């Protein structure tokens, strides 16, 4: 078992992208709500898919769809959270304007200390650290290649406060090694309670899942999810 585990952080996967999911996540007493933030005009909005220019048509790797419902923006998410849960951002935009807007909003709403920000564009995380050293930044690691690259950065002297890593990449040795460096490990795409419990025993700090019943069970707030 991890030697110095703090409280477990339960994170509702992409729940900030949908008003209905956001309400459900808060009703489930999760610790944090994940939101995929993109710059859309003058707003930071929460969605995973991209948008075709000038059209309300959105696409991802496997689909395209029209969207009629107004998008959830960052301010609306923070209004809903209102201290009931923290925000876990997956930053999707690469522009400096998006970063500046994000940081300005977090400062204005006085939630810098409680917010975690992850992303696959690691240079953006470095820039955010330069602007606001108190932010909790998590390097997103989704495959073996990015894990190898991250470990080379550590060997080269780079510091990191956290990682958001695909659960399949985590083993006991890796969890212990990162924990020894003071790196907060959040495992995502966790969809089995037994796996979540194993990760926790290894010292993983956070579990990201779209299964709210699983997250409730991890905190002892409900029965195991039905399978």
Q: Whereabouts are the PLM-identified features?
A:
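Phosphate-group recognition and catalysis centered on beta-loop-alpha active-site segments
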Residues: 1-227
């Amino acid at each position: 078992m991890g030697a110095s585990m703090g409280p477990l952080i339960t994170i509702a996967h992409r729940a900030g992208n949908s008003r209905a999911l956001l309400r459900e996540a808060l009703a489930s007493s999760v610790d944090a709500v994940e939101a995929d933030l993109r710059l859309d005009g003058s707003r930071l909005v929460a969605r995973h898919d991209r948008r075709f220019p000038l059209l309300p048509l959105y696409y991802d790797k496997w689909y395209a769809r029209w969207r009629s419902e107004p998008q959830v923006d960052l301010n609306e998410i923070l209004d809903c959270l209102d201290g009931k849960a923290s925000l876990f951002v997956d930053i999707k935009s690469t522009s400096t304007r998006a970063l500046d807007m994000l940081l300005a909003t977090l400062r204005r709403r006085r939630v810098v200390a409680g917010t975690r920000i992850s992303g696959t564009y690691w240079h953006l995380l470095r820039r955010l650290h330069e602007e606001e050293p108190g932010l909790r930044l998590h390097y997103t690691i989704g495959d073996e290649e990015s894990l190898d690259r991250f470990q080379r950065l550590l060997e080269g002297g780079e510091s990191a406060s956290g990682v958001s890593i695909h659960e399949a990449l985590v083993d006991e040795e890796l969890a212990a090694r990162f924990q020894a460096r003071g790196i907060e490990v959040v495992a995502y795409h966790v969809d089995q309670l037994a796996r979540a419990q194993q990760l926790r025993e290894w010292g993983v700090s956070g579990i990201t899942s779209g299964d709210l019943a699983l997250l409730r069970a991890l905190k002892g707030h409900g029965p195991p999810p039905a399978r």
